[in-house]
Amino acid sequence: MTFPAGAYVLRKVFIPHGCPLIFRLLLAVICLSVPSFACPKSCHCSERNSLTVVQCSSRNLEEIPPDLPHDTVSLQLSSNHITKIPNQAFKNLPWLQELDLSRNAIETVDAGAFKGVSESLRTLDLSHNHMQGVPKEAFARLHAKISLSNNPWHCECTLQEVLRELRLDPETVNEVSCHTSDQEKYAGKPVIQVLDSGINFCNFHHKTTDVAMFVTMFGWFTMVIAYVIYYVRHNQEDARRHLEYLKSLPSSSQISKDFDTISTVL
């Protein structure tokens, strides 16, 4: 069964035969007056086992539709122009099992992007996007089979920690490659192949951090030493000038002789 875009669809409600007539009438009025969802205007909706499949592929969408059917079980958003998955983008979709966001222009995935669907989601396709990295929290407690292939990944510690926890699609796992890397020699290689060889990007990260701290501390130490040297030399110069000034003053014996000469003349 399919529904036109923008149509309201009512849920099937089970009413026990033993219920009073007034209760059954009241429940019927509520169901008629409060629609369970509306199919987005840019999408096409159909029914699957009393739940809703929302087809929004190739609709020139630039963002995820905000008012999706509450009972959506499958959401197809491939081949659009979506650039970001914001926090709680699917929070009102507790039945969501299939999510296809492939072939978009996604660059950013917020930390709470999949909050609310982490338990229900079974498949997640993020292939063929523009993602270079994702926060660790974005896929927390996510049990879905995930496709991340054909993205320009930057291989570093955070990505390594993310991939270690994910259930990657085995058919596309070798297409998850390092586009760039903290270690240039790994660029262009499959991430899993690099990690399975024993490479630990987190070690590189810590070493880089240690080197940066050492350089910073060395710079401060050099500045302190330079200041001490300047201070000592400046004081020495002041002392030298003061000594020369004292030497330029007439001595007490010379003053005494000059005084005697003046007295004799007088």
Curated annotation (Swiss-Prot):
The chain crosses the membrane at residues 211-231. One of its GO terms (cellular component) is extracellular matrix. Residues 39-70 form the LRRNT domain. Pfam families: LRR_8, LRRNT. It comes from Danio rerio (Zebrafish). It is found in: Membrane. This is Leucine-rich repeat-containing protein 3. Belongs to the LRRC3 family. It is a single-pass membrane protein. Residues 1-38 form the signal peptide. Keywords: Leucine-rich repeat, Membrane, Repeat, Signal, Transmembrane, Transmembrane helix. It comes from the Eukaryota. Residues 151-204 form the LRRCT domain. LRR repeats lie at residues 71-92, 95-116, 120-141.
